[in-house]
Amino acid sequence: MNRPEESVSVEIQIDDYDASHEKKVALLLCELQSYLVDIDPEKIQLLSDDYRSNYLAHALRLAYTNHGFALIAKSNEKVIGFAAGMIEPKDEEDKLTNRCPVRGIISELIVAPEWRGKGVGKKLVEVLECRFKEENCEYSVVDVFGPNNAAQSFYSGLGYGSRNIEMMKKLYG
């Protein structure tokens, strides 16, 4: 679903999210979750009945309570993408085990299917990174679902690399 982006000459505007875009952004997030459900080999991901009405509020609350922000990408006033980012909260373990650089977290990124490959995702990430720098973040991080090879390729193309790997083993069933 997410593909590496190629820049083309298209007018793309990045703005702060506001509630007038709620329905379109909720639909984009549902499309992303549906894709993740489809590519999940263990079939753990799901698209619950409450997802559309509740997930956007959850994502915004998470971002805004952690000194974050939410962005929309538009072309001709049409919403074509959404991104959210936040400043990573530090806990006691972080203070004991890391030199604690401030990190920005890309928590959400979705581009409308017909706009993929046109530089929209790249532009959203660039604005997130700029905001992170304004907050004195030393790093930008993103958690990518393992089977989402397209997203991994997209972020690799923007200079992101693996640092941690989550491993999983099924214990019963």
Residue ranges of each PLM-predicted region?
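Conserved beta-strand-loop-alpha-helix junction that forms the acyl-donor binding cleft
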Residues: 141-151, 168-173
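Conserved GNAT acetyl-CoA-binding A-motif
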Residues: 125, 132-144
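Conserved GNAT-fold acetyl-CoA-binding loop/helix
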Residues: 34-58
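A short helix-loop-beta-strand connector motif used in the catalytic cores of GNAT acetyltransferases and
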Residues: 54-71, 105
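Conserved acyl-donor/pantetheine-binding loop and adjacent beta-alpha core of acyl/acetyltransferases
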Residues: 84, 89-104
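Conserved beta-strand in the GNAT
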Residues: 72, 78-87, 105, 110
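Conserved N-terminal entry element of GNAT/NAT acetyltransferase domains
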Residues: 1-23, 27, 31-38
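Conserved acetyl-CoA pyrophosphate-binding loop and the N-cap/start of the following alpha-helix
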Residues: 115, 119-127
